[in-house]
Amino acid sequence: MSATRANKDIFTLFDKKGQGAIAKDSLGDYLRAIGYNPTNQLVQDIINADSSLRDASSLTLDQITGLIEVNEKELDATTKAKTEDFVKAFQVFDKESTGKVSVGDLRYMLTGLGEKLTDAEVDELLKGVEVDSNGEIDYKKFIEDVLRQ
């Protein structure tokens, strides 16, 4: 049960107090930082499946590494999303098949559908996104940029 050097370095960034543990509610952010893309529900399910962690307030790197190993199949599946899977979702809002959606529609999708983001999270995500003169974005480019992060 050994974490990679990169995972240890990222863990250190999350362990702001240098106590060898991170807050349990930071697990999802940590998993995303090391390359997985779990939903909040999956993160909660992973924690709840381990009875020894349900009441814990923090997690050590060894505990997290163990959780990753036990849930490797589910976590790996979260990284398999392809651009085309997301494009299909955006096409529902692209009624004229232009490859673009309005910023308003994008904001609606991100704050109102699926795993909802807050307005502040959407604002952060939209920083640096190229918006054309009609107030629209190229959603394929947007998806690729987000998946690359």
Curated annotation (Swiss-Prot):
Pfam families assigned to the protein according to its UniProt record, in alphabetical order: EF-hand_7 (PF13499)
Residues noted as binding Ca(2+) 1 in the record, renumbered to the chain: 15
Domain EF-hand: 2-37, 81-116, 117-149
Cell location: Bud neck; Bud tip
InterPro entries: CALM/Myosin/TropC-like, EF-hand-dom_pair, EF_hand_dom
Superkingdom assignment: Eukaryota
Primary localization class, coarse: other
Molecular functions per Gene Ontology: calcium ion binding; identical protein binding; myosin II heavy chain binding; myosin V binding
Binding-site residues, Ca(2+) 2: 94, 98, 100, 105
Location in chain, cross-link Glycyl lysine isopeptide (Lys-Gly) (interchain with G-Cter in ubiquitin): 116
Keywords noted in UniProt: Calcium, Cell cycle, Cell division, Isopeptide bond, Metal-binding, Motor protein, Myosin, Repeat, Ubl conjugation
Summary of subunit composition and partner proteins: Interacts with MYO1, MYO2 and IQG1 by binding to their IQ domains. Interacts with SEC4.
Function statement: Essential light chain for the class II conventional myosin MYO1. Also acts as light chain for the class V unconventional myosin MYO2 and for IQG1. Involved in the assembly of the contractile actomyosin ring at the bud neck during cytokinesis by recruiting IQG1 to the bud neck. Also required for chitin and MYO2-dependent secretory vesicle deposition to the center of the bud neck for septum formation. May stabilize MYO2 by binding to its IQ domains.
Name of protein: Myosin light chain 1
Source organism of this protein record: Saccharomyces cerevisiae (strain ATCC 204508 / S288c) (Baker's yeast)
Upper taxonomic lineage: Eukaryota, Fungi, Dikarya, Ascomycota, Saccharomycotina
Protein encoded by which gene: MLC1
